[in-house]
Amino acid sequence: MAISSIFLLSLFSLIYVIPIEATHHVYQTLETLSSHHSSKSNHQPYRTAYHFQPLKNWINDPNGPMRYGGFYHLFYQYNPKGAVWGNIVWAHSVSKDLVNWTPLDHAIHPSQPSDIKGCWSGSATILPGGKPAILYTGIDPNNHQVQNIAIPKNMSDPLLREWKKSPKNPLMEPTIANKINSSSFRDPTTSWLGKDGFWRVLIGSKIDTKGMAILYKSKNFVDWVEAKHPLHSAEGTGMWECPDFYPVLDKNLLRTGVDTSRNGDDDVRHVLKVSLDDTKHDHYLIGSYDVVKDVFVPENGFEDNGFVLRYDYGKYYASKTFFDDGKNRRILLGWVNESSSVADDVKKGWSGIHTIPREIWLHESGKQLVQWPVKEIENLRMNPVNWPTKVIKGGERISITGVDSVQADVEISFEISDLGKVESLRKWIDPQLLCSQKGAGVKGGVGPFGLLVFASQGLKEYTAVFFRIFKYQDKNLVLMCSDQSRSSLNKDNDMTSYGTFVDVDPLHEKLSLRTLIDHSVVESFGGEGRACVTARVYPTLAIHDKAMLKLTSEY
């Protein structure tokens, strides 16, 4: 196999089984966002440098992202008093580019009976005339989950620094009449305006083990009435947290996004995403929105399989999208929890980050969504490094030098010329289990091949991101894994391996891998964004300049 160009965005192609050619280009490092993000301190080897992360304390769900007044606004669940969950407020940051963020004062904090015990997740909607409104879940004195509204105090302030709550709060609440579970009624979506002039919003809920998205309607965005039936529900899925419902363009080669209120057109399909509380993963369905019956109808293949597809097959939850009307794209943000122990989080003084914002759109096949880091992240790239073409044989590991191995953006493409030695899968198996059984140290017919990230001298520690190819029912099946089983000598960490199958035919197209590396997070995008896997890792040896980045090909 041969390498031809590493960019950091490390680009290289590999032809497998026999020696192959490849190219790779590398940017030597990704610029650290600002001094308060810097993780160069020996005492903070795991603080990220270019991911969204507060200076200290606990962060979880992204809330109410929107573009207003020339700024991107991001609100988020935050504990101002510590590095564990509790005392939740809506913190607020703004950005011009979705990469460099400036923190502002907290936007929403407990102050009314309807939210006195917490201001939980919700969404922002831009009303006619360009006025933002936030619907969010509050916890009342009885620990009931209710829905509230807040609007800006000063519409002329592009930073939206102050918000006021309605005296009519709560606008939606569980009652004896509606029989809604008061402990399972949260996370309102971005609202959409129907052609009948009514606003609609979804609230996540459940009845026993049936998860559902309860639908409410309003003419004035204040007086809401529950619809006769949920927009959608599914038995055995448990509580639906952080639902998201939005249109996507069919056959969208330009990756264009559309406004949330776009519906009923022939070129539009809809996505229903839910964060399943039982599994702590974000799943989605693709289907159509029946605007007459007010129901979501999953397409063939999604009905029987249920919530099989996921945004990200690693550590990723409570995501939220918004339509960026400035660039006609839909942006996805998600929360990445720690894999360290609570005791270690308290010692660090912080917990949780957000992924790099991703563009999201419908793949041309119509069978799944595609995600890719926003273009703006490329402005952080520095110092390109170019490698001449190299031949790599099976069993070789090549160090990628001249780069900052703990803070990088790597792109690779693999080209396979011979699949005669692929392993056979006799029966279907869960890909995450398969990644655990056949990790980076287990040789196969074709694979594993990919990257070793945060690798220590002697490989006592490393995180592996790799592909492996199988034959299943006379078709080639590509497995993508993020193997954390040897990521740290600290056994208190969660070192679960993750993975998924990638819908790529390796005979007719290259296998691409892009990996964003940032001190304790590894975001990987396979098949040009058709599969995403995020990992949190905390090596004890492979930190700072002791960490190595390697290309590996074991077969």
UniProtKB/Swiss-Prot annotation:
The broad enzyme category this protein falls into is hydrolase
Q: Where is the active site?
A: D61, D140
Q: What are the EC numbers? A: 3.2.1.26
Q: Tell me the superkingdom of the source.
A: Eukaryota
Entry's SUPFAM superfamilies?
Arabinanase/levansucrase/invertase (SSF75005), Concanavalin A-like lectins/glucanases (SSF49899)
Going by the UniProt record, its keywords in alphabetical order are: Disulfide bond, Glycoprotein, Glycosidase, Hydrolase, Signal
* CDD domains the UniProt entry points to: GH32_Fruct1-like
Q: Which residues are glycosylated?
A: N154, N181, N337
What does UniProt give as the signal peptide span? 1-22
- Tell me which SMART domains the record gives: Glyco_32
Describe the reaction catalysed, as an equation. Answer: Hydrolysis of terminal non-reducing beta-D-fructofuranoside residues in beta-D-fructofuranosides
- Which positions form S-S bridges? C435-C481
Q: Name one GO biological process term.
A: carbohydrate metabolic process
Where substrate binds, per the record, is at W58, I59, N60, D61, Q77, W85, W120, S121, R186, D187, E241, D277
Q: Does the keyword Hydrolase apply?
A: yes
Q: Which Pfam families match?
A: Glyco_hydro_32C (PF08244), Glyco_hydro_32N (PF00251)
A molecular function annotated in GO for this UniProt entry is: beta-fructofuranosidase activity
Q: Which family is it part of?
A: Belongs to the glycosyl hydrolase 32 family.
| Entry protein name | Beta-fructofuranosidase, cell wall isozyme
The protein's organism comes out as Pisum sativum
